[in-house]
Amino acid sequence: MSRYLVFDWGGTFMKYALMDEKANIVEKGKVVSPGKKDTEESFFAVIDTIVEKYPGIDGIAISSPGIIDSTEGIIDVVGVFPYLQKLPLTQLFEKRYGVRTSIENDGKAAALAEVWKGNLSDVKDGAVFLIGTSIGGGIVLDGKLRRGKDFFAGEYSSMCVNIAQPSSASSYVAQLGTSGLIEKVMGYMELDEKIDGEQAFAFINAGEPNALKALKKYTDDLAITIFSINVLLDVEKTVIGGGISQQPILLKYLKQSIQDIRTYHPDFLGGINLPLPEVDTCRFYNDANLIGALYHFLYEYHK
């Protein structure tokens, strides 16, 4: 049985797992991620301590934030680790550890997990929206992940929704990250003290009227973005992931917001009955990036 060491690099923690070719996790763990002020040398020192635990592995697969040239194995635009920008990472790993290595963007890795074994495995065309610090994900067309010529496909956060205020964070889809929902709850409830996502959903799930109004405004904005992507690509299914997607009430409200688009605009484009996107949650949550990174490795080296 082949064994692979798979990494999910994040800003807070660096997760890793020993996995087989069917994505079964044999063992996993995590360490605190190196900081932005660390160096390439100190970064690799952390990786060394993990790789040393697993002699005889058949490859290394990596999921990482940033705009990633997955063909050349280079992080073109760094998401977390500035000292890794433009380095030939897969070459460095292969030379250092003696095994084949692949790297993929974290949002695209999560999309690949859904294509391989998740809630997009039964469709040819789909979209994944990951709600985290901002909005990332991936686009799947004809069963294949669409990366784009600059590897920028699926970076929804950069979509501008208010050109009149280009320097404002509220002008971009990035506002629909978890912090955007929290800010809406705080605003609608007129809270002075900062709350976190868990507290926001405590108010929402308790049925607090203003918190529910905030959630509806949030899902209305998210629905418009999902609808716009669907008008462009006409996908069979859109799935949402990220921590807050595990809250059932989010999907319930999002589905209603999508229906409301047609209700509020019955004469849109002369009454054309535009198809509404089918939405669901991702199957995988915490392990999605690991599973997708492994799939990318297997596809690259065993296609």
Regions found by a protein language model. Give the residues of each.
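ATP-binding/phosphotransfer module of carbohydrate and carboxylate kinases, centering on a glycine-rich
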Residues: M1-G59, S70-E72, K95-V99, K117-D122, ...
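A cytosolic small-molecule/anion-sensing beta-strand core signal
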Residues: D20, S64, L141-D142
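Short hydrophobic alpha-helix segments
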Residues: G29-V31, G79, K149
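Adenylate-forming
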Residues: V46, A110-W116, I139, S158-V161
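A charged helix-plus-loop insertion that forms the helical arch/lid used to bind
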Residues: G73-K86
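Active-site neighborhood for divalent-cation/phosphate handling
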Residues: T90-G126
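Active-site glycine-centered loops adjacent to acidic/histidine catalytic or metal-binding residues
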Residues: D106, G132, A293
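Glycine-rich phosphate-binding loop of actin/hexokinase-like ATP-binding domains
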Residues: S121-Q175
